[in-house]
Amino acid sequence: MVPHITTSISDSPLDVAALIGAAGSPEAGGIGVFVGTVRATPAQPETDRAVVRLEYEAHPTLADETLRALAHDAATKWDLIRVIAIHRTGSCELGEPTVVIACSAPHRAAALEACRWLIDELKTSLPVWKKEIYSDGSSWI
């Protein structure tokens, strides 16, 4: 079976429900989902400043290629039916989704394992950079 893979680096707000729905399939026994959102606590716990929003920048071509390759690797390794992997760029407000990963498979274990692997790989290898914005300044993470 050839998996259906959808990836994107997007400067538009993410429609989480639509993206999860797109991962569904009559052959799927489960969909593993991860939704990353903007939180008020900073990445560095020693920082006592609250995050107001995040700003993401990406290397457009390389980020697209990397995300697609990671999604393909996950689909192959776990025999997935569908893979959705979308990452935001631009300014993102508190609570706003910044990344959506949805993997469907015949059985839940594969869907969940693939989803976990994909977000972990994305965090270490995707050329997307994050800046925390505070009320009194900013910091690249």
Q: Where are the language model's segments positioned?
A:
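N-terminal, polar/charged subdomain of small-to-medium soluble alpha/beta proteins
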Residues: 1-98, 106, 110-141
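Phosphate/diphosphate ligand-binding glycine-rich loop within oxidoreductases
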Residues: 101
